[in-house]
């Protein structure tokens, strides 16, 4: 019998955190969830680490959209949950997800808590959660989940280097009922800690505004790579 849920995790050179994160997810496998990790060409030990701690470990071209689509293609679950490697799904959040899957909605996302050093990360998370609730557009940090049949019907994630999560949310919100799981995922605040809180927030807002203004994803990706390299 096929599982109710498949979790798909795209990774690229995540060896320093991957073992701990996958070990923390073993409880879902004990509860019948299929766990798929898709490696985008890591040069560290990510693939081997994932192989020992997942049901399927796949290889794909680098890029979250490509990797997540590849994972979904091999998934056997009725539902899909796309989870970033630096985001934790605790048991309470998992139980809340199962409750959501038994409802009338066809897709949704979680509220998020950002774990980091800066006190304003609480405000950042609150703003992310409020924005998603208002616009019904969620980001990958918020753990997008949906029926596999719905994911296939809209063609999966658009093949974009950035904003693939936003684009998929926009496609789904117009055709299916959504659900917000209020028990939060916990995501790593390392990008805010390393890049500086204000600079990182301004960069993310700038990217989102440019996307909404019609700037193409390839140009956005070039800009993102440029500012990350500073």
Each PLM stretch: what is its role?
Residues 80:
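Short aromatic/hydrophobic "clamp" motif used to bind/position activated sugar donors
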Residues 39-47, 87:
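A conserved acidic beta->alpha catalytic loop
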Residues 23-26, 32-41, 58:
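Short beta-strand/loop segment that forms part of the nucleotide-sugar
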Residues 1, 170-230:
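Hydrophobic helical membrane-anchoring modules
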Residues 91-120:
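Conserved donor NDP-sugar-binding/catalytic core segment of glycosyltransferases
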Residues 16-20, 44-52, 92:
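Acidic helix N-cap motif at the loop->helix transition within catalytic regions
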Residues 13-27:
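Short, well-formed alpha-helical segments that are part of the catalytic scaffolds
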Residues 33-36, 47-76:
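Conserved donor nucleotide-binding strand/loop of the catalytic core
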